[in-house]
Amino acid sequence: MANDPVRVFIGTSSNGEDAKIEMAYEHSIRKNCSRPVDITFMRQTNDKESFWHGWADKNWSTPFSGYRWGIPEACNFEGKAIYTDVDMINMRDMAELIDIEIPEGKLCIARDGNRFGGKEFCVIVYDCAKWKNVVPAVETWKADPTAHHQFINLFIQNDLVGTLDKRWNSHDGDTDEIWQLHYTHMPTQPWRPAWFTGQIQEHPHKDLVEIYEKAYDEA
């Protein structure tokens, strides 16, 4: 509904390695949003009561990869929700993002890209009710280390993902206009996450680094 809070689920690292970008990103979301925002940081946990406890993450490329497929159930299959990775800065009202209509026959929308069968699942908008009775209950698959990639294949092969404007997931500024900036190249992420052990590189676009620095300073 138009007056409901904007529900945003953010996949992040487990032990505070991304604390700086978490703070800057959350600030940017709340600053730009015209409605109340309900933010959930999804991270690995030892809390057995948590919805995010006990997931098999052996084959995940990040500490949170598979969590995105449980978000509609976490919302009780009601309303709409947004998923994003943590390595982002928001630059446009997320109420506009969550209010995008999910096309008939689609479970969600994501931008087109070169990975994952032609979709980039780092920003997703869900119509949670559409997932009920289509995707099995989380408890039946969260211990399966292959589930994350099975879901990607399922959604791509059955054409269940609609198209999201690329400006809502601009990969290091690969769009002329940026609504949601995604620092996708890990070696150049300006907050220097502790978990990254590869060769650090300077970001090629100083103006994009300044966007992060401004959001962090404001937060």
Task: Describe the function of each predicted region.
Residues 2, 31-36, 74-82:
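Short, solvent-exposed loop/edge-beta patches enriched in aromatic
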Residues 2-14, 18-19, 23-24, 33-35, ...:
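A glycosyltransferase accessory/donor-loop signature
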Residues 6-10, 51-58, 79:
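Glycine-/proline-rich flexible loop or hinge segments
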Residues 37-74:
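Active-site-proximal specificity loops/subdomain of glycosyltransferases
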Residues 59, 110-112, 217-218:
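Carbohydrate-active catalytic/glycan-binding domains of CAZyme proteins
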Residues 67-116, 123-131:
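GT-A fold catalytic core of metal-dependent nucleotide-sugar glycosyltransferases
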Residues 119-123, 176-178:
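Short hydrophobic/aromatic beta-strand or adjacent loop that forms the aromatic wall/cage
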